[in-house]
């Protein structure tokens, strides 16, 4: 049976009940009941006619404390005789037609005007925006999955930083502990006699009668040399002497070393070429990390990072709308956000060098390095602690006679004493009375030359003398003015590569360098740490791998036991023995005079008993720096010495095979200028001079071709103490070489 449709009132009631029981769900979130703000009832103009439905008015049925809730925009339905205004999802409820017919009022029933519902008015303008509400509680989002580490970037390539400023000199350290008392010193040498004292005052004149003249006495013993007399008047110019013939005297013995002079003033800073770069030293141990440096200046703001994907929707119940509060205080600093993408490289920072860091711990002692070259002479050190008193020295030279004392009382006659040593001559007394003429004395020694007298008158021009022998080399003169630049010489041959220098001390740590440009993306990083997981199922055995690389050679094994003796071999056939290495054939071709070279110089025997024709040649090195002056330099380390013609004990080459020889020497200069000469039979044939520059090691060379006869001697020698800075060391060699070019 069909159910007839109910009246419109029943439909509205059912619709109201169904809507009141619905809970609004948006995006999976549940919204509870909220109190609605009071709404202004819609204004209904009375002139608009409305239909009056039949039946009784349906009173308002509240379903909650404050009315029906359909959302935030739901108006509140008041009690009254009118129908509630029910919005349906932002749409107004359309009047329900009655089967396509309009409602007709019944007879006898009046419809009050207040119950008539007018048409919906136009939508009003939006109201002003309310004040912002208080900040909500921070959401608690689920942290995202940790991303995989990115690939390792390429190592940046930056320019090396500028060298740091030299650090300030450190403060003077605490005085060291008192050293142990040194060994007792030896008795010192006899001191230098003191200066002669001033003459004493004249004695009081004696009181006595003059005696008669005595008999002439015997001639006295030879007196001591009298004091130096005053210079006499210039004598007349004597006749011109004959030409003298004298041999140069032997060089005197080297005197005792003088006292250390005060340190000289600091010289100007030298300007020289930098030395050859030494090999890098061994890598030191890893130092402890230094203290964190000061933060650098803030760089420019980087490019904002790419916006991340929206997070998962939060789960929570919406609270009730509160009354808009007053603007709150500024919120605290939020948590640090995720790091953005790296920005472009900033401008190079210009910062001051930081303060020197604290002194680090003392590192592990390194391997002792090779012996360095001899350093320059240091300043005179502070006087040391006084040693224990030494033994009494030898009696010194008697000093000069002191001034006479006052006349004392006559004492008792003493016993005869031991005859003392002869005293020094007393001061010159006043002239006495004229004595009798004595006998002529013995001829005295020649006195010292007097002070140079006044120049005498210019004498007549003498005859031209014979040409004298060349004199000894004089003391080098002062440095002359700088000469004009000479003509550039031909380019010399390239010398042999030098020996690598000793590794210098490490310089101070410089300030941090300017950051280099951004490097290219690096290669994939090393594999991460092994994860912690359950062991998987054992896989199948794979194919055998390729054979590995050949390992390092093992240590040689112990020698095995000797084997049994072998069978005797066949008889040997001795081939003719060639000349040993370093020997030359006797027939050396024509000499300078066109005659075949003689064979009389093959007196030595070779290794196999035959004659050995060894070339006269040698090269010797100097092992100790600063050899003595005025004597042949002893190059005592031999590299080669054919026929043993060079003597390393004396430093002299003695010719045995006459001929034309070539000699060369290479010396180093350090600590002072150097002046060397090549001598042939005590006559210098070539000089070489080099000026020393402080802080640099210089070199000088020389060579000569000499014609030698048997017995001629050739050697090197330094003629002056003022230029004796010849240096040699473990890795700095001074050498002397010579060899026969062609025999005579």
Curated annotation (Swiss-Prot):
Location, primary (coarse class)? secreted
Region of interest (Disordered), residue spans: 101-435, 478-584
Which stretches are tagged as biased composition: Pro residues?
Answer: 128-137, 288-298, 389-403, 558-579
Composition-biased stretches, type Low complexity, lie in 168-190, 478-506, 540-556
Region labeled Triple-helical region — which residues? 118-571
Cell compartments where the protein resides: Secreted, Extracellular space, Extracellular matrix, Basement membrane
Tell me which UniProt keywords the record has, alphabetically. Answer: Angiogenesis, Basement membrane, Cell adhesion, Collagen, Extracellular matrix, Hydroxylation, Repeat, Secreted, Signal
Residue numbers spanned by region Nonhelical region (NC1): 572-744
From the record, what ranges are coiled-coil?
none
Keyword presence, Manganese: no
The signal peptide annotation in the UniProt record is 1-27
Q: What's one GO BP annotation on this UniProt entry? A: angiogenesis
C1q domain ranges (all copies): 611-744
Task: Give start-end positions of Gly residues composition bias.
Answer: 203-217, 328-337, 411-420
Region (Nonhelical region (NC2)), start-end ranges = 29-117
Checking Pfam families in the record gives:
C1q, Collagen
What superkingdom does the record give? Eukaryota
What are its GO cellular component terms? basement membrane; collagen trimer; extracellular region
The UniProt PTM text for this protein says: Prolines at the third position of the tripeptide repeating unit (G-X-Y) are hydroxylated in some or all of the chains.
Note in the entry: 4 consecutive G-P-P tripeptides are present at the C-terminus of the triple-helical region. These may provide high thermal stability of this region.
* The protein's assembly and partners: Homotrimers, or heterotrimers in association with alpha 2(VIII) type collagens. Four homotrimers can form a tetrahedron stabilized by central interacting C-terminal NC1 trimers.
Q: Which PANTHER family does the UniProt record give?
A: COLLAGEN IV NC1 DOMAIN-CONTAINING PROTEIN, EMILIN ELASTIN MICROFIBRIL INTERFACE-LOCATED PROTEIN ELASTIN MICROFIBRIL INTERFACER
What the protein does?
Macromolecular component of the subendothelium. Major component of the Descemet's membrane (basement membrane) of corneal endothelial cells. Also a component of the endothelia of blood vessels. Necessary for migration and proliferation of vascular smooth muscle cells and thus, has a potential role in the maintenance of vessel wall integrity and structure, in particular in atherogenesis. Vastatin, the C-terminal fragment comprising the NC1 domain, inhibits aortic endothelial cell proliferation and causes cell apoptosis.
Spell out the protein name for this chain: Collagen alpha-1(VIII) chain
This chain's source organism reads Oryctolagus cuniculus (Rabbit)
Gene name per UniProt: COL8A1
């Amino acid at each position: 049976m069909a159910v007839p449709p109910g009246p419109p009132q029943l439909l509205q009631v059912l619709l109201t009940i169904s809507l009141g029981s619905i809970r609004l769900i948006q995006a999976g979130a549940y919204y509870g009941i909220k109190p609605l703000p009071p709404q202004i009832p819609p204004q209904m103009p009375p002139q608009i006619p409305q239909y009056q439905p039949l039946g009784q008015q349906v009173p308002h049925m509240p379903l909650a404390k404050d009315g029906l809730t359909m959302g935030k925009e739901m108006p509140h339905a008041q009690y009254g005789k009118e129908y509630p205004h029910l919005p349906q999802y932002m749409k107004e409820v359309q009047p329900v037609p009655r089967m396509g017919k309009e409602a007709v009022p019944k007879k006898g029933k009046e419809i009050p005007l207040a119950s008539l519902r007018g048409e919906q008015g136009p939508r009003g303008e939006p109201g002003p925006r309310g004040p912002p509400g208080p900040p909500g509680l921070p959401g608690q989002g689920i942290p995202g999955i940790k991303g995989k580490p990115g690939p390792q970037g390429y190592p940046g390539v930056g320019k090396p930083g500028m060298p740091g400023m030299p650090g300030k000199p450190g403060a003077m350290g605490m005085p060291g502990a008192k050293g142990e008392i040194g060994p007792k010193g030896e008795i010192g040498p006899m001191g230098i006699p003191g200066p002669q004292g001033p003459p004493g005052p004249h004695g009081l004149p004696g009181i006595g009668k003059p005696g008669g003249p005595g008999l002439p006495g015997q001639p006295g013993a030879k007196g001591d040399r009298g004091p130096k007399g005053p210079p006499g008047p210039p004598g007349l110019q004597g006749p011109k002497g004959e030409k003298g013939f004298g041999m140069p005297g032997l060089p005197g013995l080297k005197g005792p070393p003088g006292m250390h002079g005060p340190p000289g003033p600091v010289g100007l800073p030298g300007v020289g070429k930098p030395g050859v770069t030494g090999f890098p030293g061994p890598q030191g141990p890893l130092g402890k990390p230094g203290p964190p440096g000061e933060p650098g200046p803030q760089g420019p703001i980087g490019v904002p990072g790419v916006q991340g994907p929206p997070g998962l929707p939060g789960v929570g119940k919406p609270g009730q709308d509160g009354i808009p509060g007053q603007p709150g205080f500024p919120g605290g600093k939020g948590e640090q956000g995720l790091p953005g993408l790296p920005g472009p490289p900033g401008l190079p920072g210009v910062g001051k060098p930081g303060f020197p860091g604290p002194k680090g711990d003392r590192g592990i002692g390194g391997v002792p390095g090779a012996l360095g070259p001899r350093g320059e002479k240091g300043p005179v050190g502070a006087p040391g602690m006084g040693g224990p008193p030494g033994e009494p020295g030898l009696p010194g030279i008697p000093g000069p006679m002191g001034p006479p004392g006052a006349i004392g009382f006559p004492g008792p006659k003493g016993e005869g004493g031991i005859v003392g040593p002869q005293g020094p001559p007393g001061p010159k007394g006043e002239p006495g009375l004229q004595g009798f003429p004595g006998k002529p004395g013995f001829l005295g020694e020649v006195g010292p030359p007097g002070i140079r007298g006044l120049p005498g008158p210019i004498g007549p021009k003498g005859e031209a003398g014979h040409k004298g022998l060349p004199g000894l080399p004089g003391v080098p003169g002062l440095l002359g003015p700088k000469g004009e630049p000479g003509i550039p010489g031909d380019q010399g041959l390239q010398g042999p590569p030098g020996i690598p220098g000793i590794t210098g001390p490490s310089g101070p740590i410089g300030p941090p360098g300017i950051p280099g440009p951004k490097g290219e993306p690096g290669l994939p990083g090393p594999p991460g740490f092994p994860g912690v997981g359950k062991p998987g199922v054992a896989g199948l055995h794979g194919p055998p791998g390729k054979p590995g690389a050949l390992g390092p050679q093992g240590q040689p094994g112990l020698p095995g036991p000797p084997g049994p003796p072998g069978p005797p071999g066949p008889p040997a056939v001795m081939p003719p023995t060639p000349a040993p290495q370093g020997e030359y054939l006797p027939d050396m071709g024509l000499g300078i005079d066109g005659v075949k070279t003689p064979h009389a110089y093959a007196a030595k025997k070779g290794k196999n008993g035959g004659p050995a024709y060894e070339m006269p040649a040698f090269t010797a090195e100097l092992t100790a720096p600063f050899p003595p002056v005025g004597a042949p330099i002893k190059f005592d380390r031999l590299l080669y010495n054919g026929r043993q013609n060079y003597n390393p004990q004396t430093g002299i080459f003695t010719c045995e095979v006459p001929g034309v020889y070539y000699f060369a020497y290479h010396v180093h200069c350090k600590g002072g200028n150097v002046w060397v000469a090549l001598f042939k039979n005590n006559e210098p044939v070539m000089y070489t001079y080099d000026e020393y520059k402080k802080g640099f090691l210089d070199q000088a060379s020389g060579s000569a071709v000499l014609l030698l006869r048997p017995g001629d001697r050739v050697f090197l020698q330094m003629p002056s103490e003022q230029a004796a800075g010849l240096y040699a060391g473990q890795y700095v060699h001074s050498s002397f070489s010579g060899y026969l070019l062609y025999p005579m």
